[in-house]
Amino acid sequence: MEKILYVEFEEGKFKTDTFIVKKETNGTVETIAKDGTKRKFFKSNLEKNKQNYIIEPNDEIKEKEFFLKNKKTEMEKIIEQINDEIKNLN
């Protein structure tokens, strides 16, 4: 079964991408994007850069769960920012 790499990039704004996994080792994940671009991810770099990632079988339910979980995380971050701004006003 085909596996998918889900990556949440934290580059100033919330963005999640998915990649088809072609080869996975202990240290790297070789992928191909939807547009055909090949990419190699080093797992240590993903962890070091605080990027969330999971590798799962290509399953629509898993994909939806991942995106919903990350949307919740995004909302929690926004709520924290609003609460911080309210504290600063007081």
Question: Which residues does each PLM region occupy?
Answer:
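Generic hydrophobic/packing signal
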Residues: 2-4, 19, 60-63
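Short beta-strand-centered aromatic/proline hotspots
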Residues: 15-23
